[in-house]
């Protein structure tokens, strides 16, 4: 999302801000999921986003602004009110994606993660600061409790096999870029793990990543 912070990329911010102003406060019975980003926590606590948060100082807002006019293959105008990701929302989304296919076994890249973020934002209304993972090396666990997909390292041979034999993993050839964008040069793959709905592994292994109330 870093590229979204470039100067001259904020022309669509007015439309995003207007949508935030129009968004109704949602029921407080279901809090945001542990592990979501700052904007989602503000949405849950205040029912809106303080004006102090802008594309200039928040990567998720800048990411949304930079994709306002982008053709992404699904409705550009959000279909539902803006809301923070919840445990149930992440849990249900995980099972939907598992049953429909398309994410399990797909080689991870930042671009693919952004496509997923945009689709979830536009169709479900969940603010895109929920899909974050623990640092590497090794398996990366989701920070958002309820999201049941982790990122697991695979060998170049396995990535090559997936790219050649699995249509859903062939959007980009694994050998082209995957691994090079990772700090530890690992090729990562989305893998469904039902147990992540019972144990918040990220909070246990990396408590320093979570806001202390």
Curated annotation (Swiss-Prot):
Monomer; cytosolic form. Homodimer; membrane bound form. Interacts with Nef associated p21-activated kinase (PAK2); this interaction activates PAK2. Associates with the Nef-MHC-I-AP1 complex; this complex is required for MHC-I internalization. Interacts (via C-terminus) with host PI3-kinase. Interacts with host PACS1; this interaction seems to be weak. Interacts with host PACS2. Interacts with host LCK and MAPK3; these interactions inhibit the kinase activity of the latter. Interacts with host ATP6V1H; this interaction may play a role in CD4 endocytosis. The keyword Zinc-finger does not apply. The N-terminal domain is composed of the N-myristoyl glycine and of a cluster of positively charged amino acids. It is required for inner plasma membrane targeting of Nef and virion incorporation, and thereby for infectivity. This domain is also involved in binding to TP53. Gene3D superfamilies: HIV 1 nef anchor domain (4.10.890.10), Nef Regulatory Factor (3.30.62.10). Residues 114-130 are annotated as: Mediates dimerization, Nef-PTE1 interaction. Residues 154-187 are annotated as: Binding to ATP6V1H. The record marks 20 as: Might play a role in AP-1 recruitment to the Nef-MHC-I complex. The virion-associated Nef proteins are cleaved by the viral protease to release the soluble C-terminal core protein. Nef is probably cleaved concomitantly with viral structural proteins on maturation of virus particles. A lipid is attached at residue 2 (N-myristoyl glycine). One of its GO terms (molecular function) is GTP binding. Residues 75-84 are annotated as: SH3-binding. This is Protein Nef. Factor of infectivity and pathogenicity, required for optimal virus replication. Alters numerous pathways of T-lymphocyte function and down-regulates immunity surface molecules in order to evade host defense and increase viral infectivity. Alters the functionality of other immunity cells, like dendritic cells, monocytes/macrophages and NK cells. In infected CD4(+) T-lymphocytes, down-regulates the surface MHC-I, mature MHC-II, CD4, CD28, CCR5 and CXCR4 molecules. Mediates internalization and degradation of host CD4 through the interaction of with the cytoplasmic tail of CD4, the recruitment of AP-2 (clathrin adapter protein complex 2), internalization through clathrin coated pits, and subsequent transport to endosomes and lysosomes for degradation. Diverts host MHC-I molecules to the trans-Golgi network-associated endosomal compartments by an endocytic pathway to finally target them for degradation. A motif (Diacidic) lies at residues 181-182. It comes from Human immunodeficiency virus type 1 group O (isolate ANT70). GO terms for biological process: symbiont-mediated suppression of host antigen processing and presentation of peptide antigen via MHC class I; symbiont-mediated suppression of host antigen processing and presentation of peptide antigen via MHC class II; symbiont-mediated suppression of host autophagy. HAMAP family: NEF_HIV (MF_04078). One of its GO terms (cellular component) is membrane. It is found in: Host cell membrane; Virion; Secreted; Host Golgi apparatus membrane.
